[in-house]
């Protein structure tokens, strides 16, 4: 345990230095975020902010590819992170759009297929200590839903300073506590990912000096999805990723009603933009979403332990 804490402490300052260099490098090259005209007008001032701070999450995972216990989550983090990185590069070139949504989902499907090949196959699905079902078909469906949904959901959540990073941090603290008893390489990787997130939030807190980019959102999504599979808490992920689910549902509802009734349910989706346009300050939206995320996670854990 002491080794994990010491390593994380040293790593925090290393990550701060890496991010500071990355910010300065992008500024010197004129690299920065392009803000789409369709977004809230208050976001126009963020134009030019350095991007792809989430590369640091890939740096964390690369060494852990060489350990049996951490190969699967590391591979998941890196593959989804590379998908996000490709999207970021396309956004830099095309300005107004990156990888098209359907193509992004298709690529997520291909990555998930590769991950399924490399994963251990325990077809049991639990809620707490209760076995819900043991079925290869249901497990495969759940596996694909988790890996396609979570990275894309975190990507949708990444729209305000500190929002995706902070909510992911809350979720990862659950997995750290859940795995701390084992005191193995996976525990160390989770601890270092949390450390990297804290270092990132040092610069991403409002007003952000750098954004995580799609590389960060997808890497975190791949990591969290893999942890839910490893720890057999796939169903609990609905509560562990509460805000991710809410943000995704808001987009689905908005698109569905617009196509059906030609009207919008929200002023703008994802949901965090709706509250911005309602007059909430960005920091208020972020902190209230943190609270909702934490409450949903605690509520889910209580329900999980009742069985």
Curated annotation (Swiss-Prot):
Q: Which InterPro entries match?
A: Glycosyl_transferase_4 (IPR000715), PNAcMuramoyl-5peptid_Trfase (IPR003524), PNAcMuramoyl-5peptid_Trfase_CS (IPR018480)
> Could you tell me which CDD domains the record lists for this protein?
GT_MraY (cd06852)
Q: How does it sit in the membrane?
A: Multi-pass membrane protein
- Coiled-coil positions: none
Metabolic or biological pathway = Cell wall biogenesis; peptidoglycan biosynthesis
- What GO CC annotations are associated with the protein? plasma membrane
Q: What is its EC number?
A: 2.7.8.13
A GO biological-process term: regulation of cell shape
Q: Which reaction does it catalyse?
A: UDP-N-acetyl-alpha-D-muramoyl-L-alanyl-gamma-D-glutamyl-meso-2,6-diaminopimeloyl-D-alanyl-D-alanine + di-trans,octa-cis-undecaprenyl phosphate = di-trans,octa-cis-undecaprenyl diphospho-N-acetyl-alpha-D-muramoyl-L-alanyl-D-glutamyl-meso-2,6-diaminopimeloyl-D-alanyl-D-alanine + UMP
Q: Which domain of life is it from?
A: Bacteria
GO MF term (any one): phosphotransferase activity, for other substituted phosphate groups
Annotated membrane-spanning segments are 3-23, 47-67, 71-91, 105-125, 137-157, 162-182, 186-206, 210-230, 237-257, 285-305
Its subcellular locations are: Cell inner membrane
Classify the main location.
Answer: membrane
Q: What class of enzyme is it?
A: transferase
Required co-factor(s) are: Mg(2+)
Which family does the entry's similarity section mention? Belongs to the glycosyltransferase 4 family. MraY subfamily.
HAMAP family, from UniProt? MraY (MF_00038)
The protein here is known as: Phospho-N-acetylmuramoyl-pentapeptide-transferase
**Gene (UniProt):** mraY
């Amino acid at each position: 345990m002491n080794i994990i804490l010491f390593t994380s402490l040293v790593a925090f300052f290393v990550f701060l230095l890496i991010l500071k260099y990355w910010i300065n490098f992008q500024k010197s090259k004129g690299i920065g975020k392009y803000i789409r005209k369709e977004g809230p007008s208050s976001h126009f001032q963020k134009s030019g902010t350095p991007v792809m701070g989430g590369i640091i999450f890939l740096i964390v995972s690369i060494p852990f590819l060489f350990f049996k216990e951490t190969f699967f989550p590391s591979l998941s983090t890196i593959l989804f992170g590379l998908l996000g990185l490709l999207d970021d590069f396309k956004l830099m070139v095309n300005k107004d759009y990156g990888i098209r949504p359907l193509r992004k989902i298709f690529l997520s499907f291909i990555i998930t297929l590769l991950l399924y090949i490399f994963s251990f196959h325990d077809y049991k699905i639990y809620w707490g200590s209760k076995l819900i079902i043991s079925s290869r078909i249901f497990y495969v469906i759940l596996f694909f839903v988790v890996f396609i949904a979570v990275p894309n959901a975190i990507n949708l959540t990444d729209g305000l300073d500190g929002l995706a990073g902070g909510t992911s941090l809350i979720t990862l603290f659950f997995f750290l506590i859940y795995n701390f008893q084992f005191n193995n390489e996976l525990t160390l990787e989770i601890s270092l990912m949390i450390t990297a997130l804290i270092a990132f939030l040092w610069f991403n807190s409002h007003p952000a000096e750098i954004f995580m980019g799609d590389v960060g959102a997808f890497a975190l999504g791949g990591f969290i999805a893999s942890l839910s599979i490893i720890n057999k808490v796939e169903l609990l992920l609905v509560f562990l990723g509460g805000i991710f689910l809410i943000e995704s549902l808001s987009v689905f509802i908005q698109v569905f009603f617009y196509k059906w009734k030609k009207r919008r349910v929200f002023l703008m989706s994802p949901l965090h933009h709706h509250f911005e346009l309602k007059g909430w300050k960005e920091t208020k939206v972020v902190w209230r979403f943190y609270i909702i995320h934490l409450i949903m996670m605690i509520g889910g854990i209580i329900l999980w332990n009742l069985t």
